[in-house]
Amino acid sequence: MKNSFLIFFYLIIIGFTLSVSSCKKPLTFSKSNLSFSQDTIIFDTVFTTIGSVTKRFKIYNNDSKTLKIDKITLLGGANSNFRINVDGISGTHFSDLELASKDSLFLFVDVTIDPNNGITPMIVEDRIQFLTNGTNQLVELVAWGHD
């Protein structure tokens, strides 16, 4: 009886030890930078009465480790004519995103041009800033508009 109690006790101790210890490696992040499918997104002839098409580009992590994106920011903020959608979420500022090794992320952009009652074409510009590992990277946004 005493032996079976000791065996049971040791099995509980071993089971507890195995459940507390983990075989999973700690997550380490890459020190690399992002790469992009395009460095400039251009919208050609956007009319003020009609919205633009939605353009997309890809953000790549070419490294063998997960990459932590500290910030993605539409620099014009809420006052920008451009709108962005990152990973299915609309907004102007995104933070603490993780991009797995050899993976990519879609970023969608559209624009609305405000009328100015002029006859000359308008140029609307903004930039998307990416902060990763202390490095700033920019993607330019340019739209040609007309009333």
Question: Which residues does each PLM region occupy?
Answer:
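Terminal connector regions
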Residues: 115-145
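Bacterial N-terminal signal peptides that target proteins for export
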Residues: 1-10
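Beta-strand secondary-structure signal
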Residues: 56-58, 106-110, 127-129, 140
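C-terminal motif of bacterial Sec signal peptides marking the signal peptidase cleavage site
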Residues: 19-22
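Short beta-strand-initiation
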Residues: 9, 52-54, 125
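Surface-exposed binding patches on compact interaction domains or structured appendages
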Residues: 24-45, 51-53, 62-115
